[in-house]
Amino acid sequence: TSNIHHPSFVNNIDTIITPFTKEDFEEFQPDILVTFGGMVVSKRIKAFLRKYKPKHHWHIDPLRAYDTFGTLTHHFEVHPNTFFSAFYPLAQKVKSTYSSQLAHVKYLRKQKHDWYVSKMPFCDFMVFDKVISNLPKNSQLQISNSSAIRYAQLIDIDPSIEVFCNRGTSGIDGSTSTAIGAAVANGKPTVFMGGDIGFFYDSNALWNNYIPNDFKIILINNGGGGIFRILPGHEET
């Protein structure tokens, strides 16, 4: 969800850490955590770093510092490019298996993911996987909040596709409006994926008469509120 890509990056963090044991969490507890950018989608990575705290947490942002994990030790008030341009020449290489171990776990998870996808029955996750895997290159994917973005972050998305989602609104506010506005602003072919509850909540967005002709909506009509079937206590809702 960062729209930053590299072969060594982990794009689907929940698939990596969900099966972790206590020993795995302790093994991958970081000494230094460096963050930049906006809100973190994954609840699991937040829970991991809040419990297995790094010794140092540096956040890089010209304006604000998010203490998402309750561990912030320093705020560098510069652009990330400026920070890394100055910091990288000062860094010293050390012997560590952290990266290779993580790469191995990533490989194993990918094998299991591919096997599961090939065997799974028709379900919400299959729909998201099929649609996202067939999006046109260099397009923009706008995703509704709640379960939609959580499914999407389990899927490998083509690096040429920009991904956006409303976060920090504690719900489904304005996802369709945001998607239409983004489609108008950047001119890229835009696909909006969301559930029926989120779609109808913001259906007034479709009253606008300037919606681009290539703007597409994929509506997952799964009976409403898929997130409530995922969260604890869903039996009582």
Listing of model-derived features with the role each one plays in the protein:
Residues 1-56, 158-186, 200-204:
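Glycine-rich, anion-gripping cofactor-binding loops and their flanking helix/strand elements
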Residues 154-237:
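Thiamine diphosphate
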Residues 2-5, 60-66, 147-148:
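Short, polar loop motifs at secondary-structure junctions
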Residues 1-2, 57-62, 216-221:
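Short internal beta-strands
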Residues 104-188:
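Active-site diphosphate/adenylate-binding microenvironment
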Residues 37-41, 63, 146-148, 197, ...:
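Short glycine-rich anion-binding loops that position phosphate/pyrophosphate groups of nucleotides
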Residues 52, 57-101:
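Terminal amphipathic helices with adjacent charged low-complexity linkers/tails
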Residues 5-13, 66-75, 226-235:
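Glycine-rich, charge-decorated loop segments at or immediately adjacent to ligand/cofactor-binding or catalytic sites
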